[in-house]
C-alpha cells in the first residue's frame, strides 16, 4: 500500500487527487489549513471508499516547523511517504505597481517555499522508497502561470515559474535514485481559487459574474473550465509505473492555451 501525502487536500484539485488515490487503495496523509475542511473530505473519502486509511494534519505551509511536524505526524501514523503531491497554493492579483513586498513574499512563500519545505521533509522517505524499487514520486501542482505570463499576477507567476525550475532541477538530481519529479500545470480550473478570482474581477471591474467567468474561459481554446478530476487523472498517470520514464516535465492541462 502506497503512502501518499497531499497538501491542500481539503478542496478542489487536492480533494480530487485524494479521491483518485483512495480508489486505488492508497493510504493518505491529507494536509491543509482548516481541520473542518479536512474532516469533511475524510467523510467523503470514507463514504466513497470504506476502510480507506487517512491521516489528517493541520499545517501552515509557510512555517518550517509546522511542515516538519505535519510530516512527522504523517510518518508516525502511516509510515514512510512514497508519493508527495504538492498541491497547496494561493493566487492573489494586483497590478505590479501596487504589489507591495508583503504580497510578493506571500506568493513566493506559499507557492514556492512551501513546496520546497514539503520536499525537504519527505525526501529521505522518497529516496528510501526509490532505493527499494518502489514508484517514488513527487508531483508539483504548478499552473499555466508557470509556463507563461498573465497580467496582474506577477508575484504568483514568478512563484509558479520558480516551481517549474525547482521541478526540473530536482528531477535531474534524483534521476538515478528511483524518484521522478514532475509538474502539472492546470489552466483555469473549477476551484475555489478561480471562484475567488471571478469575485475579485467583479469587484474591481464592475463586470457581472458571468462576464468575469467568460473572460477567464476565453483563455482556453476549448472555451471551457478545466475540471479538478482531469488534473487528478494526470497526476495518477505520473505516479503510475507506466510513467517511470517521465521526469522533469511540466504537463499543461489547459485545452491548448499554453502552446
What do the PLM-derived regions correspond to, one by one?
Residues 10-11:
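Conserved glycine-rich cofactor-binding loop
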Residues 95-96, 103-108, 216:
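Substrate-binding pocket helix/loop in short-chain dehydrogenase/reductase
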Residues 119, 159, 167:
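Active-site helix of classical SDR
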Residues 143:
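Residue(s) in the substrate-gating loop at a strand-loop-helix junction
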Residues 175, 180, 246-248:
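Short, small/polar-rich loop/turn modules that mediate ligand/substrate recognition or access, typified
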Residues 222-253, 258:
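C-terminal substrate-recognition "lid" of short-chain dehydrogenase/reductases
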Amino acid at each position: 500500500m502506497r503512502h501518499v501525502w497531499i497538501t491542500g487536500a481539503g478542496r478542489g484539485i487536492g480533494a480530487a487527487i485524494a479521491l483518485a488515490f483512495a480508489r486505488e487503495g492508497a493510504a493518505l496523509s491529507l494536509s491543509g489549513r482548516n481541520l473542518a475542511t479536512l474532516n469533511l473530505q475524510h467523510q467523503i473519502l470514507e463514504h466513497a471508499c470504506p476502510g480507506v486509511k487517512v491521516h489528517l494534519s493541520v499545517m501552515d505551509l509557510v512555517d518550517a516547523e509546522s511542515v516538519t511536524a505535519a510530516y512527522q505526524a504523517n510518518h508516525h501514523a502511516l509510515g514512510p511517504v512514497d508519493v508527495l503531491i504538492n498541491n497547496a497554493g494561493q493566487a492573489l492579483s494586483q497590478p505590479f505597481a501596487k504589489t507591495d513586498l508583503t504580497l510578493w513574499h506571500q506568493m513566493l512563500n506559499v507557492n514556492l517555499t512551501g513546496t520546497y519545505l514539503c520536499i525537504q521533509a519527505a525526501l529521505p522517505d522518497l529516496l528510501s522508497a526509490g532505493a527499494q524499487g518502489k514508484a517514488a514520486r513527487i508531483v508539483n501542482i504548478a499552473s499555466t502561470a508557470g509556463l507563461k505570463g498573465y497580467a496582474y499576477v506577477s508575484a504568483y507567476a514568478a512563484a509558479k515559474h520558480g516551481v517549474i525550475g525547482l521541478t526540473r532541477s530536482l528531477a535531474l538530481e534524483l534521476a538515478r535514485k528511483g524518484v521522478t519529479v514532475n509538474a502539472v500545470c492546470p489552466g483555469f480550473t473549477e476551484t475555489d481559487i478561480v471562484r475567488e478570482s471571478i469575485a475579485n474581477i467583479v469587484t474591481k471591474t464592475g463586470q457581472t459574474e458571468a462576464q468575469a467567468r467568460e473572460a477567464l474561459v476565453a483563455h482556453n481554446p476549448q472555451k471551457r473550465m478545466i475540471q479538478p478530476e482531469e488534473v487528478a487523472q494526470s497526476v495518477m498517470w505520473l505516479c503510475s509505473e507506466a510513467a517511470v520514464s517521465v521526469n522533469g516535465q511540466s504537463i499543461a492541462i489547459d485545452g491548448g492555451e499554453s502552446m
